[in-house]
Each structure stands twice: as structure tokens, then as C-alpha cells.
Amino acid sequence: MNTVKTVRELRAAVARARSEGKRIGFVPTMGNLHAGHAALVKKAGERADFVVVSIFVNPLQFGPSEDLDTYPRTLAADQERLLEAGCHLLFTPTVEEMYPDGMDGQTRIHVPGVSEGLCGASRPGHFEGVATVVSKLLNMVQPDLALFGEKDFQQLAVIRKLVRDLNLPVQIFGEPTVRAADGLALSSRNGYLDEQQRAAAPAIYRTLRQLGERIRAGAEDFPALLADARQALEQAGLRPDYLEIREPISLRPGVPGDRQLVILAAAYLGSTRLIDNLSVHLD
């Protein structure tokens, strides 16, 4: 595995791989990698011949009161995990490399519709930062395919629309959420949880599953279902940010009669905000 820090080095390495007829796969990350990231890299290796991973904690997607300064930087451990997972090229740019003219003057990309509401309402400017950095990275790497985890479901919807609307020549794959044995979705922010909070955290997925089962059983009073689910989260010690039933492509509110739905949740344990989702297929 080769590690590069500049766009010039990145493009040269990718060009060499492409000249050898290799199909390029790409997995963008913010580091502090866990088994979910490793699964994305391994899947990229199944779909492509040359796997590029980026590690960049993107300031543009953090709000002023969020955890940019405290977000864990664990490069040495990340490199070991990526080597084991089959990464060929690691790109670790600085903020100055990504935003050479500073962030205030950086052209930004807004993806309408799917970026609004849910996490977009709770974290103003977040998806603009995500869309901007992903656009830059896709232009830098120019991969044949890129992989993202379905845990960040709204982010995946934003990226799919971004790629479609801007006619970017890349296939986007969403990969299933990797979970701990008790159902908690793996997340770099799980490390912020203390022992008591970690014990309470699986209630998010448990509540989503119970809600999904009720919908599959024919329940159609979505407001009542959501009220019950919010109460279940609160009783488990979580503070819900949002809990919504949506249509999975447009992310419009789901209605009875929709055959494909996704339930999305965000909740706080102390100051740590966790997100999760569950797809519901009514065939």
C-alpha cells in the first residue's frame, strides 16, 4: 500500500494503475476506521482491481459547535487496518491541499431536496460540505466506482443525486451497515460513549426493528407509530433528534401504500449523536 499526500501524487498513481487496465474503486473516509470501513474496502476490492481510500477530516462539513477539533485522528492504526483490508493507495491530504485558497472562498455544492430535513435540519451546512468534498475527491481520483455505507443513508442519497445531476462518470454503491453483536451500527463516534451509554445505545436499532415489524404487519397510522417509537427511545435513556418514515429515493415523507420505505433516526446519548436506519420492503 502506498500513501500519498498531494493531488499530483494521487493522480499519478491512479494514472499508472489505469494504464495497466485496472478498474479503480474508491472509498472516502474521515479516518478513525472500524470494521465497517474495512468491509467497504474489501467490497471495493471485489468490484475493482485497484482500491483507493482517502482519509480527510473535512472542516467544511462540521458546524461551529461540533466535534471537528476532537474527532479522533488515528492514522497509524488506520494504515494497518487498510493494509489488511486490501487498500492499494491511501490519500491523506492536508486542509491546505484540499482547500488551497481557504474555505471561505471555496465553491460549494448544494444538493436540493434530499439534503434538506433530517440531518440537514439538525446540522445546517453539513451536506453542502459533504457534497463539496465528495465532488472534489471524485474529480481528483476519477474512479470507476465509489462505495459508501448505508448507515449514513441521507448522505448516500445526497451523493447519488449529486452524481446523477452532475453527470459524473462513476458508479455509486451503497453497502449494508455493519453492526456490533448487539445491533448497534458501527460508527467512529461510538468511542465517545461511556459504559452506561454504550449499554443503552442498541435501543436505537431495536426500536427501528420493532417499528419496521409493525409496518410490515400492516400498521398504517405512521404518526402514532412514530410517537410510540420516540417514547421507546426516551424510556431507554436516549434523546431523539428525529425519527421519520421516508421514501428511500427522494426522502419525501412515506405514506401508506408506499412499497419501499426507510425509517431514519438520530438520537443523543449525552452529547454524542448517533444515527441509524432500517429499510422496509413491502412486497
From Swiss-Prot:
It comes from the Bacteria. Pathway: Cofactor biosynthesis; (R)-pantothenate biosynthesis; (R)-pantothenate from (R)-pantoate and beta-alanine: step 1/1. Beta-alanine binds at Q61. InterPro entries: Pantoate_ligase, Pantoate_ligase_C, Rossmann-like_a/b/a_fold. It catalyses: (R)-pantoate + beta-alanine + ATP = (R)-pantothenate + AMP + diphosphate + H(+). The keyword Ribosomal protein does not apply. Signal peptide: none annotated. The keyword Ligase applies. ATP binds at residues 30-37, 149-152, 178, 186-189. Homodimer. The reaction proceeds by a bi uni uni bi ping pong mechanism. This is Pantothenate synthetase.
